[in-house]
Amino acid sequence: VEEERLSAIPSRCFRLIDQTGTTGCLALALLNDEGIIAGCEGDLQSVFTMLAVKVLTGKNSFMANPSMINARTNEIILAHCTIGIAQTEQFIIRNHFETEIGIGIQGILPTGDVTIVKCGNESLDEYYLSTGTLVENTNYINMCRTQVRIKMNSPADYFLKTPLGNHHIMLYGNYEDILEEFLQANACKRIE
């Protein structure tokens, strides 16, 4: 990272598992805690989003899968097997959900206001941006280890109808205005 002067790196997680027999979840968590943006599954759009969030807000973020979407209650559950330890109130070392090997991290996160953002499209010229409230840490057996239920301030059916990919980025606090200003200044189109 230092030699190449990198600010962010994606990891091809499932290839890593195939090659080494273990996961990179803990390594990615520790890199993020050290201020090196590290994302999963080779998702360059989400890694770019995480980098933009860090530069604009100074905050670390959580890359996650929308794993449960309830349009009726306007809630989603975001889940993933890695999160920077510094973002958690406490954490539990578990195995990786999909493979049941290696290390996955179940982070217990504080409740409160959050921002959800994703830069997308091949040219990174579209984005999703919303705020919500993290209301609960869940512990379902059928999804990745860190799980948070979020009551959205915009329609949750976006995740069912027009999502900009799978991973979305969550950060603590309401940063909608600063992110909106940056994305609009760069001629990006907001997707609702």
Pin down the residues of each PLM region.
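C-terminal catalytic subdomain
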Residues: G35-N142
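Fold-independent oxyanion-binding glycine-rich loops
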Residues: R12-F14, P66-S67, C81, N174
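Extended hydrophobic packing segments that form well-structured cores
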Residues: G104-E192
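Long, internal scaffold/assembly segments composed of regular secondary structure
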Residues: V1-V47
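Flexible, glycine/charged-enriched surface loops at secondary-structure junctions
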Residues: E2-A8, N60-P66, E192
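Generic preference for flexible, low-structure residues
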Residues: I17, T22-C25, M68, I77-A79, ...
